């Protein structure tokens, strides 16, 4: 074969791939579409459309949709993208609970499992967890497509290569590797910071998000960044982890061993008085009790300072989630935004601060998206 023939063959293959990707992308974004509509929208020949539809349906990537009315009187077959032809599983491990969530390629949960399983850094725990994951995955594959992999959302920090938990004081898993955690899991596996995983789901709930600082005000606060509509992790897999930014030099001790961290001041654990719970604090706050209002003001000031500091570097919108967010109403959020604005020299003309739409499954869903997002990118990424 001459060089010219090789070039022609390569060009034809690229064209075929582009046509296939264009059809997949159109069906995934427009729902049920007929061949005729694909022909009109994509400006492709009917034989090209028909051949691709046949191949994609054979591969399970698309499926027949409902019959639709046509001008000729005979109903036309429509086609749709099949988001469950591949699946992925996300896992969260906390002190007493193991949570699994399987998602399709569009990030929708297709099955969940929550089990009481007290964490222990032992092979017995990891093997028991692995057995639960393998059984769960087998059930998913019976009803849907193959599982691409299993991703673990970890509170704390992970190594730059994504294989080791480098800090986790909530379960004591610091230093544990992915090989230990997933020692009996029969699928590809990954680690991700839980805050980063939850942030990934923010883009599912709000497709308009472009740049955002995600701040999760749990008892152990954490953060993550969304840039250009996607999670931004950076080369060290810790971008957005603002919880250990120094807020007050030489201030309160933090659980990381340093002093003055944002986490030490912005945790909702700072709100209750002795022997009072966090829900109890907000219940009394609603009644207008003076000392509770003072504590709330101090806490909001510290949260606002943390946000204003971060926005000096990344002038983005802000999403507030976590346990504390469950008790914050519209007035609290508006108040917090005013405090941030008052602390900011510039960058508040176009600035939105809102509550997260995450829920108890968001960490697992976002973790699973580590497998589904790259698969979808490869499925319809334009050729270069």
Which residues does each predicted region cover?
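Adenine-nucleotide phosphate-binding core of ATP-dependent small-molecule kinases
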Residues: 124-141, 265, 270-329, 355-356, ...
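Glycine-rich phosphate-binding loop and adjoining helix at the ATP-binding site
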Residues: 109, 113-211, 329-342
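Nucleotide/phosphate-binding catalytic cleft detector across ATP-hydrolyzing
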Residues: 1-75, 79, 379-384
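Glycine/GP-enriched mid-protein hinge/lid loop-to-helix segment characteristic of carbohydrate kinases
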Residues: 112-114, 121, 183-291
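Glycine-rich phosphate-binding/hydrolytic loop that grips phosphoryl groups
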Residues: 5, 12, 17, 25-28, ...
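Conserved phosphate-binding catalytic cores of ATP/NTP-utilizing and phosphoryl-transfer enzymes
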Residues: 64-88, 193-214
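Gly/Thr-rich phosphate-binding beta-strand-loop-beta motif of the actin/hexokinase/Hsp70
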Residues: 73-112, 214-227
């Amino acid at each position: 074969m001459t060089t010219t023939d090789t070039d022609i063959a390569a060009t034809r293959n690229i064209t075929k791939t582009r046509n296939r990707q264009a059809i997949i992308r159109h069906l995934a974004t427009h729902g049920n579409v007929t061949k005729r509509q694909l022909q009109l929208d994509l400006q492709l020949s009917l034989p090209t459309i028909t051949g691709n539809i046949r191949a994609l349906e054979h591969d399970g990537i698309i499926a027949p949709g409902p019959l639709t009315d046509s001008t000729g009187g005979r109903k036309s077959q429509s086609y749709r993208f099949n988001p469950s032809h591949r699946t992925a599983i996300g896992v969260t491990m906390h002190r007493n609970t193991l949570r699994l969530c399987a998602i399709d390629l569009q990030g929708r949960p297709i099955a969940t499992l929550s089990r009481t399983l007290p964490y222990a850094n032992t092979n017995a725990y990891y093997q028991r967890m692995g057995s639960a994951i393998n059984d769960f995955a087998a059930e998913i594959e019976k009803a849907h497509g193959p599982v691409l992999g299993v991703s673990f959302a970890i509170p704390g920090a992970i190594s730059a290569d994504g294989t080791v938990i480098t800090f986790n004081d909530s379960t004591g898993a610091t230093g544990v590797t992915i090989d230990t955690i997933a020692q009996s899991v029969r699928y590809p596996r990954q680690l991700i910071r839980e805050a980063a995983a939850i942030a990934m789901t923010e883009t599912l709930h709000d497709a308009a998000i472009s740049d955002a600082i995600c701040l999760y005000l749990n008892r152990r606060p954490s953060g993550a960044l969304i840039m250009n509509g996607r999670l931004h992790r950076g080369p060290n897999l810790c971008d957005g982890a603002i919880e250990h930014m120094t807020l007050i030099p030489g201030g309160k001790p933090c659980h990381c061993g340093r002093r003055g961290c944002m986490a030490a001041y912005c945790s909702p654990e700072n709100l209750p008085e002795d022997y009072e719970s966090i829900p109890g604090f907000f219940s009394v706050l609603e009644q207008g009790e003076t000392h509770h209002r003072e504590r709330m003001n101090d806490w909001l000031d510290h949260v606002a300072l943390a946000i204003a500091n971060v926005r000096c570097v990344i002038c983005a919108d802000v999403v507030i989630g976590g346990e504390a967010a469950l008790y914050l109403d519209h007035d609290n959020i508006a108040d917090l935004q005013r405090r941030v604005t008052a602390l900011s020299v510039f960058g508040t003309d176009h600035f939105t601060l809102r509550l997260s739409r995450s829920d108890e499954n968001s960490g697992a869903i976002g973790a699973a998206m580590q497998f589904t997002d790259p698969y979808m990118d490869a499925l319809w990424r334009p050729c270069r």
